[in-house]
């Protein structure tokens, strides 16, 4: 079984506001996790009896951070999950284990545990730790539907909801299912991860900064990793047209199905 390690307490002040909506399907707001401080280390596995599986499922987005099957998404996406499956743009589905959660930053690391999964080629994008510039052109791809959807916009604030310094505010239209999707700049660098939007105002969305993701990855205990987690250092997207960038990225972005 894969152990879930709690690295902090899920920030709920802004996330519980009626003006903030998390973006996993079938969920309008992130419920306040009042028991996070006392949360028990849990195991999410794929061996529960069929009768124990909760009825229905919801979906979100995740993307590859290491070609050997490590995928990042939001903590609120996998919270309380019995099992997790990842589906690529070709419709192939794989079992995944939640190996690490970072409730404070609303991040979760998954590992594809399915024996049919084959390691991918080099991840085409890199991860930008430094803050991006106000007004910078950005885009995301994710799964608000069962097929991948592209959205574009710009960075409208260097802080997120309620002045959160670990997040950006973006002017990108997003919908339930976009949670966990990558936010990239024109050079093909991941600058953040979609996490929510402001209700009542069209096009105002929020993304966790890549810096928080990199800190979270560094905090993963080595004994919880099935194999080495290697972040891409070579960018294969810089200088390409946007359409060509998307073609290279889409095989690394997954529909996250949570049961």
Residue ranges and their predicted role:
Residues 14-43, 47-50, 118, 193-259:
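C-terminal cap/linker of serine protease catalytic domains
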Residues 41-65:
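Coiled-coil termination/hinge junctions
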Residues 1-15:
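Single-pass membrane-anchoring alpha-helices
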Residues 67-149, 163-167, 176, 223-235, ...:
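Conserved active-site neighborhood of the chymotrypsin/trypsin-like protease fold
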Residues 174-194:
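Catalytic nucleophile loop of clan PA
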Residues 57-59, 80, 175-179:
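Short, small/polar residue-rich loop motifs at catalytic or cofactor-binding pockets
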Residues 62-64, 96-98, 155:
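Conserved hydrophobic positions within beta-strands
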Residues 74-79, 151, 157, 176, ...:
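Short beta->alpha transition motifs characteristic of CBS
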């Amino acid at each position: 079984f894969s152990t879930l390690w709690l690295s902090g307490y899920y920030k709920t002040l802004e996330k519980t506001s009626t003006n903030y909506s998390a973006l996993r399907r079938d969920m309008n707001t992130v419920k306040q996790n009042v028991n996070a401080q006392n949360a028990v280390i849990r195991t999410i596995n794929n061996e529960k009896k069929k009768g124990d599986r909760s009825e229905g499922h919801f979906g979100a987005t995740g993307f590859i951070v290491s070609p050997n099957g490590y995928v990042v998404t939001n903590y609120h996406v996998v919270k309380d999950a019995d099992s997790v499956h990842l589906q690529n743009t070709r419709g192939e589905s794989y079992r995944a284990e939640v190996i690490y959660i970072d409730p404070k930053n609303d991040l979760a690391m998954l590992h594809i545990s399915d024996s049919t999964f084959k390691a991918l080629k080099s991840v085409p994008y890199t991860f930008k730790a430094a803050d991006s510039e106000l007004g910078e052109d950005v885009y995301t791809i994710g799964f608000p539907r069962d097929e991948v959807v592209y959205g574009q916009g710009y960075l409208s604030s260097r802080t997120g909801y309620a002045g959160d310094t670990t997040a950006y505010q973006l002017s990108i239209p997003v919908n339930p299912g976009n949670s966990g999707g990558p936010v990239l700049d024109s050079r093909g660098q991941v600058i953040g991860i979609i996490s929510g939007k402001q209700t009542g105002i069209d096009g105002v969305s929020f993304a966790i900064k890549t810096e928080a993701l990199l800190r979270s990855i560094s905090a993963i205990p080595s004994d919880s990793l099935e194999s080495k987690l290697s972040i891409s250092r070579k960018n294969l997207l810089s200088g390409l047209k946007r359409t060509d960038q998307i073609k290279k990225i889409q095989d690394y972005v997954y529909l996250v199905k949570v049961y």
